[in-house]
Each structure stands twice: as C-alpha cells, then as structure tokens.
Amino acid sequence: MACRVMEVLLRVLAILLSIAGALVMAKDKQDTFVMLGTVPVPLYARHSYVEAFVFLVYANGIVAIYCFIAVLLSLLAKSRVLAGLLFFMDQALAYLLLAAAAASTEVAYIAKRGEKKLVWGEVCSNFEHFCNLVGVSLVLTFLSVLVLVTLAILSGKRLFGHPPLCAPPSTPPVHQGV
C-alpha cells in the first residue's frame, strides 16, 4: 500500500512539474527595443519562434497527460501487464522529455553565450526576462525527468525485482504448541 501511495505521489509531482514547465515556457515572451543610431528598432522574443521550445511545451504536456492516465490506471487496476506497460511508458516518456529538455538547453546556451564559430551573437542581454523564464522552465522540466526516471526504476524493481518491490511482507508461520 505504501508503494502505491508513493507511486501516485510521484506521478502527481510529475504532473505538476510538467504542467508548470509547459506553462512557464508557453507564456514566456518579451518585447524590447534596440537603438540603431537614432532609430528604435522593436525586437520580439516568443517561445513559438524556436522549434526546441515548442517541442518542450508539447513534451511536457504529453508527460502530464500520460501521468494523469497512469495515476487512474494504477489506482483502478493491478496486473503484471499494467506494470509492464507502465515500466515501458515511464522510460519512453522520460527519454522524450529528456530529449526536449536537452534540445532546449542547447538553444538557451547559444542564446546566452552565442556561437563564435558561426558568428552568432548572444541575445539574452536584450531579452533577460525571456531567458530567465526559459531557465525556470528547463529546471522544472529536468526535475520532471528525474521523477520519471525514479518511476521507471520503481516500475522495473516491481516488475523484475527478487523479491518484488512492494510485495506484501511474508508472515512467518505460526507454531502451535504441542
């Protein structure tokens, strides 16, 4: 019972982290002006301008929906087939979210530092608020990845462990006096 509660709490935590990561990124935008001589030129930053950030929003949304469904399934059914499915899906979605977070981290790094070999300048000096919120979204997403990895480990131990994780404790036989 305690393991089931822990699993549900971890899945709820993954839901909350993924929703927060998606919302922070999806709402992230900033408008600014730079001066070219005496002419102010407007600049705009939106998450939708960068494919990796769009991927991050969708991946977080998919993980949140999956974890919600997994909570319902784990509360309603107990079977080895379901345990195997959750084990597989926990890993698959951890990899999906890790890929989205890694791609977005690379874009954020280039935005912060630039890429000298390609003569790309950094942009975060003009969009500090935008870049800070990208960082917040990435932290939330990587935390969600860690929760999913933990769930995959727990699912694997439950499925393949000897003795199985969360198995009911065996009670020693009661000896009756002769």
Swiss-Prot record:
Alphabetical keyword list: Cell membrane, Membrane, Transmembrane, Transmembrane helix
Cytoplasmic side: 1-4, 74-80, 154-178
Record topological domains on the Extracellular side: 26-52, 102-132
Subcellular location: Cell membrane
Coiled-coil parts of chain: none
Bilayer topology term: Multi-pass membrane protein
Pfam family, one: CASP_dom
UniProt superkingdom: Eukaryota
Gene Ontology annotations for the cellular component aspect, listed alphabetically: plasma membrane
Residues that span the membrane, as ranges: 5-25, 53-73, 81-101, 133-153
Alphabetical list of InterPro entries matching this protein: CASP/CASPL, CASP_dom, CASPL
Assigned protein family: Belongs to the Casparian strip membrane proteins (CASP) family.
Oligomeric form and interacting partners: Homodimer and heterodimers.
Protein name: CASP-like protein 2U3
UniProt source species: Pteridium aquilinum subsp. aquilinum (Bracken fern)
Lineage of producing organism: Eukaryota, Viridiplantae, Streptophyta, Embryophyta, Tracheophyta
